[in-house]
C-alpha cells in the first residue's frame, strides 16, 4: 500500500469517521492507524480475513464517496495551501509579526 493512499485514508477517516458504524471505525483504526494486518484484525474479531478485507474496501469506497460530496479534505488542503502562501507573502513585510500572528490565529480555528 502506498504512503499517499495511507495518508489520504487517514485524513478521510479523521474527517468522516462520525459517519461510520462502530465496526467500520474499529477496522479502519486498527488497519490504518495501528498498522494491524488483515489477519490480526480477523483474529481479534473472530471473522475471516476476507470479511475484514471486504469491510475495509467498502469503508474506503464510502469515505471516497463522502469526500466527493462534501469535499472536506479538498477544502482543508486548499486552506492549508493559502495559509502557506500568506506566510510567504508576509515574510519581509514591515507588519510581518502582526500578519503572522493573524495567520496563526486563523490556523488554530481550522
Curated annotation (Swiss-Prot):
Pfam families the UniProt entry points to: UPF0122
Domain of life: Bacteria
Signal peptide limits: none
PANTHER family: UPF0122 PROTEIN CBO2450/CLC_2298, UPF0122 PROTEIN YLXM
Task performed by this protein: Might take part in the signal recognition particle (SRP) pathway. This is inferred from the conservation of its genetic proximity to ftsY/ffh. May be a regulatory protein.
HAMAP family noted in UniProt: UPF0122
Family designation: Belongs to the UPF0122 family.
Name listed for the protein in its UniProt record: UPF0122 protein YlxM
Annotated organism of origin: Bacillus subtilis (strain 168)
Lineage: Bacteria, Bacillati, Bacillota, Bacilli, Bacillales
